[in-house]
Amino acid sequence: MKPLILALGVVFAVGSPSAQTPAWPPSPGHAQVPIWPGVVPDAQPVEGPEESGTVVDRVGSKKLVAGRPWAYVGRVSQPTMTVYSPEGSNTGAAVVVFPGGGYNILAIDLEGTEVCDWLTSKGITCVLLKYRVPCVKSGPYLDCRTALEDAQRTVGLVRLQAAPWHIDPHKIGVLGFSAGGHMAAAIS
């Protein structure tokens, strides 16, 4: 009887493996690097673990953009950056990309990895930021101080790592979509 109770306790404590969505992994050959050492500053509580998946509409059909479904990441509490280096010639320029998603999720492929693939094909290093979402709602607007902190920190880290990453520190730009565009304007 005790082994059965123990087994049920483990199942209820951990949950079903199929019920847990794995966190977003970058493409092979790329690694997510935490942007904050140790404890993340101004950490906000996030309900549940980080999630990733394909965006669906209200009836459960995959939402398509240009005929393709798109992936999202949500409930991000540990922000990371993923560096995509140019495979051919390197211009020395770098762009930090902030995906959009209304400060609730991140459109990680459509406004992230696909953009990085295009930038690297042009000889530009791309740094994809997976910033903290969702943001805290404050009145009619979202208070996204934590996402802005992540953006500022990432640009600073890119400048710090410019030499080893073969980047000219005077050629670092930012590019954002939707909420990410708001962040790009805020730190410019």
Predicted region positions:
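Aromatic- and Gly/Pro-rich amphipathic surface segment
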Residues: 38-86, 93
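Short glycine-enriched nucleophile-adjacent loop
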Residues: 159, 181-188
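Gly/Ser-rich "nucleophile elbow"/oxyanion-hole loop immediately N-terminal to the catalytic nucleophile
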Residues: 142-146, 157-174, 178
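Short amphipathic alpha-helix adjacent to the substrate-entry channel of hydrolases
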Residues: 108-128
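Short beta-strand element of the alpha/beta-hydrolase
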Residues: 91-100
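Bacterial N-terminal signal peptides
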Residues: 5-15
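Active-site loop->helix "elbow" adjoining a glycine-rich segment at hydrolase catalytic centers
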Residues: 100, 178-181
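Active-site glycine-rich loops that stabilize anionic/oxyanionic intermediates
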Residues: 39, 99-104
